[in-house]
Structure formats: C-alpha cells, structure tokens
A protein has these predicted regions:
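Conserved pre-ATP/AMP-binding loop-to-beta segment of ANL
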Residues: 119-121, 246-249, 254, 259-295, ...
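Conserved AMP-binding/adenylate-forming
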Residues: 132, 151-194, 198-200, 334-338
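Structural core segment of the AMP-binding/adenylate-forming
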Residues: 155, 182-269, 379-380, 387-388
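AMP-binding/adenylate-forming catalytic core of the ANL superfamily
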Residues: 165, 191-216, 377, 384, ...
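Gly/Ser/Thr-rich phosphate-binding loop
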Residues: 265, 271, 329, 353-355, ...
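Conserved AMP-binding/adenylation subdomain of ANL enzymes
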Residues: 312-332, 342-383, 389, 396-398
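Conserved ATP/PPi-binding loop(s) of AMP-dependent carboxylate-activating enzymes
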Residues: 483-531, 565-568, 665-666
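Conserved C-terminal "lid"/linker of ANL adenylate-forming enzymes
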Residues: 587-593, 602-604, 622-699
Length: 700
C-alpha cells in the first residue's frame, strides 16, 4: 500500500513554533476550563469526538466569536441518530453576510470593524494573466453590498428566495453572494464555462428569482460573448413560477447591449431600485436555516441540490480557518477556483477572519506557465489553494515556482480536487516551493462544505495523504466488503487497513436537506443507506497506524477488486505518472459484466503529444506496476485512449467508464466537459471480440 506499516514516510515539514498557534492556545484554554491534560493534536481530536464532545463544541463556540443573538442549551443532542440530521445550537440566530462584513464586538450581538476598517483592502480582483488588478476596501464592499441588497429587497427578494449567479470569481459575484444572504436568501453559483444544459439542470430545480450573469467571459486567451447563452437560459427558465429575469454584470468597463434580451437588465439598471440607500441591514435567521445551494458532480444523472445551513458553515469554516490554519487579518488568501465548485467558498470564507481575498479569474497558464505564479508573489499571498493537476503541469514542464518569484510571504498551500500523488509531495519541497511552506493536502467537499482530512499546525507533514482529521468531525474506516443495507451495522477496521470512509457522529455542517420533492430520499440514499446511523462518504481510505495520516486511495465506487484484492485506482496512476512521462494521463477501471465471475482491471493510456502507444509500452507499464505494487495490482489489459472523460472542474470520471465497459448504457451528465469521450469505451464491453479481431477503434 502507499503507507507501509514497517517504516515512516519521509518527513517534509513541521511548524517551527507550534506553541505560537491558535490551536495550541485553544488546547491550553480547554485544559484549564475542563481540567484536562491535552498536549498533542491527537489528544485534542480524540476529546473533540469523544463522550464529552459537547464540551468541545461549547469551547469552540466561545473561541470563534460569531455575531449572533439568542442562546442555546447544548450544542447538540449526543444521542440523536445521525440520519435524523440533528439540530445544532438551537436558539441561536445569525447572518452569514454580517459575519463576513463585520467582526463581533464586546457583546454577542454587537459588531465592529477593528480588523475590517473602511480603508483596509478586503479583496483584490485579478484577471487572467495577472491583468486588470483592482483593490476593493471594506468600505467599498460594504457599500456595494448594501446598495445591491436594498435593490434586491425593493424588487421583492426576501428570506428563503434563491438568487443564482453564472459568473466569474469577481468582486461583483462576491457582492451578489453577500447581498442575497444579508436578506436571508439562498445563493447558488455556476461558472460561465458550463454548458446551457448543465446550468439549467441546476437552476430548474431551485427556481431562482433572479440570475446574475456575466455578459462576457475570458478564459485561456479567448473572449466569449455570453448573450447567446443568456438567451437560452431565459428560454429554459421561462416556465418557472418565481423567476423574474436576468441581471447582467460587466466583464469589461462597459456593459454589453442587452436591449434585445427579454426580462434582462444591466446591474446598473437593477441598482436604481435601491434609490441610493447605502445602509446595511441584516436578517438574522435560525442557525440551521439554509443559505447556500451547491451541487453534486452529477456524473450519472441530474446533479443533486445540496443545501447548507448558515450556522453550520460559519462554525465549520471558523473552526478550520482559525484553529487548523491560523487565518487572521494578516492573511492574504488566493484559492484558484471557478464559481461552479465548492472551493469558491474557500475563496470567500477567509474573509471571516479579516483576511484579504485575492479573486482570480481565468486560466493559470495564460499567457504562460509563470504568469499565475507571479501573481502569488506580487500579491504577497500567504495562503494559496491549488490542485494536484496544476502542480503536475508545473512539474511536467520543469517550472519551479520558487525560481520564478519571491514566495517568502507564502505560508501554506492547500491541494484538493483529486488524490495528490507521493511524487508531487516530494517535488513540492525538493523542486517547487520554499521549504518553509506547509503543503496541506485536504479532502472533504461539496457534501459538507468542509473537510474530513486536512492540515494542522501541530503534526508534521509526511509524504502522502492528509495530515489528519478535522477536529470535532469524527471519521472511521469501515470494512468495504460488507454488503450493507438498511439497519446493517458496519465493522470498523484497524489503522493500516484500507476501507470505506465513514463519519460515525453528526457534525454541524451536515447539509440540512436536498432541494426537491424527493430530496429526503436522495439524502438518505446518498449517505445513510449503506451502514446504519453513520455517514458513508464514498471514499476508499487508510489511516497510517503511526503518523495517523489519512491516505485517500480513490472513490469507493471505483475501487478495483480483482480476485478479491481491493485497491484504489490512485495507486495505479501513481506508478504511471512517476515512471512513464510519455503518458499524459490514464484512467483505470474494473470491468464486471453480468456473466463475469470476477472483476478484470482495464487501464487506458492517453499518450502525450509526440509519443505513440505500443504493445511494448503496455507490457512495460504492467511490469512496473507489478514491481512497484504487486502482481495482483497488474491490469489485465492496457489500451490506448484518445480522450479521458473529465468534469468541468477537470476531475477524472471513472464511474461512467466502469459502467460502460461492464455492459451498461450511460446517459452522459451535463457536468462532463467532454461527454462524447464516453463513446469510445463502449467497444470494450465486448473485449474478447476486440482482442480476437485486433480491431480496437482508435478514434471516437
């Protein structure tokens, strides 16, 4: 496996002064308050998910200092079933936008601007290639949000209404987010590169009152007029009961002419309804009231609409930001993301702590591979968020960020979106970034708007996996070979044994519901149908018995299981990437058709430009996998592929390919960036015929 028990992985980083961190100080506060003797991260984690976990949540509530009114008797009923979606901090009322735009004062209901003063820069907008850089102060932000919220209210937007954006990661998008949530409404965002069907698959389910839409988009050096897409969206949303129209936001200094579009106004025209009212007003709502709709990847159908609560996300985000990450007014956060991904929340939530958010829009590779890196240096970014795919591109092209620009301000770099391979951990420290930077491999996602595995300042960073769990959020590894079903109890495995990631205890940032008439059943089926009274997340993981790292080995539904030997596809990708530079990418799936007695592993290779696939290469790949892992890991068949299906967020999509080669017909999801790529794989459902005839079709 990726983390052998007999030896420790290579240590790459540790905090130079752990006693200076918020997490260490929090431990001392809890020790004094509850008569404890905690001294390590594991001590804190075990206490936070133990029998006294309500003590932990009480202490955390005092620590995070959210602006709120009302009071609670206990954080949660510890005996409530997890699938009942227990109510947290009942009696507390608060507002998302208020906590972003202000900081709590001396009393729980009061607010101050001490770390968000009028003249302090709140966010910086940077467009593709480091161009069009513009700073916005907290005063700018508060005034624009107030004007927009008052215009929305004048147009009838109220608590519980949905307002959507199809837009870039920009100042205007942020203002829409904060304006609708200031009124107690729900925010939903999609990126402009999504297809019309993908956007409608989302919006038709939630029936928004308004959709705020960029009028132009710029990506990868290409400028796109979005008005044809706006027209299609208007037509698609016309039957909805609550939908009033589209508001266009200017991508450039001028507005595109939208006079020919029905029910469409520009942002400036929309703001007239505010009548120049710059006073901020906040609707404080119940802790578990909804404020955000996000979406599952929808790789096998229409995406599920996951609804998160105001209090749950604020509590979880402050826990992660303040204690795990030491965020504060000195922080400069840049999360590379589109608005269509849950990581857009990460781009914004650092502002809770008074941080400056750098809102980057565009490709990180334009006009060249160093442009985005230069932005990190120029903006003196302290906390960077990127993906393994981005790091892989830098490594592949021999680009070393620390040789490109001054990264002395950078303290932490998070990576998420897919498994971070061991080779990239070592490249990060040996070649890529300064050794003082904490590489924070994190995993969690859309379902919880937070993390199951993440960094902390008290334990070292070793090669592979995540440093550890998120405090207060219990995780366990269950035996994946158990069939599961209603009422079936799972079996927890020892550390060092791979299995299925579960959360056995409720947490405040559980979604409050799924939108739609059949939302309750979809919610149950998504998380609770497999094992009784635990959240099953769908990841195949292992916890190192000594370091307690969490190794994410792949998706549980993509686990490979030839002859009863279970392993994750990430292990195969690791070997291919490390030893075969002529291969650009790969996808590995299990094939088990209705009449097959066992699963067969198929590996498809996408060749790099200028390189050709050969049977000798296939044999070399098989041999190296057997050498590096075991003979049982070796794919039975290795083929070339012209294209690998990915989502619009560039996540490799294994499940549809697995279903197709196993003899099923799959309807491509609207979230796939390249849905036609699936057609190629249908021929492998009759693999014996292909091998007999030697007639694999090499093109789509």
């Amino acid at each position: 496996m990726a983390a052998p028990e007999e030896k420790l992985p290579r240590k790459l980083w540790e905090h130079p002064n752990p006693q200076s961190t918020n997490m260490w100080r929090f431990i001392q506060t809890c020790n004094a308050r509850y008569g404890l003797k905690m001294s390590t991260f594991q001590d804190l984690y075990k206490w936070s998910v133990g029998e006294s976990r309500n003590d932990f949540w009480n202490a955390l509530w005092s620590e995070i200092r959210l602006i709120h009114e009302g009071s609670y008797s206990r954080p949660v009923d510890p005996d409530a079933r997890m699938d009942s979606i227990p109510e947290w901090f009942k009696g507390v009322r608060l507002n998302f936008a208020e906590n972003i735009l202000y900081t709590r004062g001396e009393t729980k209901e009061s607010r101050t601007t001490w770390d968000k003063s009028d003249d302090k820069v709140a966010c910086t907008e940077v467009r593709e290639g480091g161009t069009e850089v513009k700073d916005y102060t907290w005063r700018d932000l508060r005034r624009k949000v107030a004007l927009l919220a008052n215009a929305m209210q004048a147009q009838g937007v109220k608590k519980g209404d949905r307002v959507a954006v199809v837009a870039s990661n920009s100042f205007d998008t942020l203002c829409v987010f904060l304006a609708v949530t200031s009124l107690g409404g729900l925010f939903s965002s999609s990126s402009t590169d999504m297809g019309t069907k993908g956007i409608l698959d989302r919006l038709l389910q939630i029936d928004p009152v308004y959709v705020f839409f960029d009028d132009w988009a710029v990506y990868n050096g290409k400028t796109t007029d979005l008005r044809p897409k706006i027209r299609d969206i208007l037509s698609g949303l016309a039957p909805l009961k609550n939908f009033k129209g589209v508001v266009t936001m200017p991508r450039f200094t001028y507005y595109a002419n939208v006079s020919g579009l029905p029910n469409t106004v520009t942002l400036n025209e929309f703001l007239v309804a505010a009548r120049g009212d710059y006073e901020l007003r906040f609707e404080r709502v119940e802790y578990r009231d909804p404020f955000l709709v996000v979406y599952s990847s929808g790789t096998t159908g229409v995406p599920k609409c996951i609804v998160h609560s105001v209090g749950g996300v604020l509590t979880s985000s402050m826990k992660e930001g303040k204690l795990h990450r030491d965020l504060g007014p000195q922080t400069v956060q840049l999360q590379y993301t589109t608005t269509g991904w849950i990581m857009y929340m990460s781009a914004v939530l650092s502002m809770l702590a008074g941080a400056r958010a750098v809102l980057y829009d565009g490709s990180p590779f334009q006009p060249d591979l160093t442009a985005f890196i230069k932005v990190i240096g120029e903006q003196k970014v302290t906390n960077l968020g990127i993906s393994p795919r981005y790091m892989h591109e830098l490594q592949k092209n021999n680009v070393s960020p620390r040789e490109v620009t001054d990264l002395s301000s950078l303290q932490s770099c998070t990576s998420t979106g897919m498994v971070l391979k061991d080779q990239l951990f070592e490249w990060f420290y040996d070649v890529g970034f300064p050794p003082h930077v904490q590489l924070a491999n994190i995993s969690g996602g859309t379902d919880l708007a937070g993390c199951f595995g993440m960094e902390n300042p008290l334990t070292p960073v070793y090669v592979g996996g995540c440093q550890g769990p998120s405090i207060g959020t219990a995780i366990a590894v269950y035996d994946q070979t158990i069939e599961g079903g209603k009422g079936v109890k799972g079996v927890e495995l020892e550390d060092g044994t791979p299995g299925e990631l579960v959360a056995p205890l409720s947490f405040p940032n559980q979604p409050v519901f799924f939108w739609g008439a059949d939302g309750a059943q979809k919610y149950y089926n998504s998380y609770f149908a497999r094992f009784d009274d635990v959240w099953t997340h769908g990841d195949f993981i292992m916890i190192h018995p000594i370091t307690k790292q969490i190794f994410f080995l792949g998706r549980a539904d993509g686990v490979l299981n030839p002859s009863g030997v279970r392993f994750g596809s990430a292990e195969i990708y690791n070997v291919v990437e490390q030893f075969f530079p002529q291969v650009q990418d790969s996808i590995c799936v299990g094939q088990r058709r209705p009449n097959d007695h066992d699963e067969t592993v198929l590996l498809f290779l996408l060749m790099a430009p200028g390189h050709k696939f050969s049977q000798q290469l296939a044999k070399d790949v098989q041999a190296k996998i057997g050498q590096e892992l075991s003979k049982r890991h070796v794919p039975k068949h290795v083929f070339e592929t012209p294209e690998i299906p990915t989502t619009i967020n560039l996540k490799k999509v294994e499940l549809p390919v697995k279903q197709i080669v196993s003899g099923h017909t799959v309807k491509p999801s609207s979230t796939l960036m390249n849905p036609d790529s699936l057609k190629y794989y249908y021929q492998f459902a009759d693999i014996e015929k292909l091998l007999e005839q030697g007639s694999v079709k090499s093109r789509l």
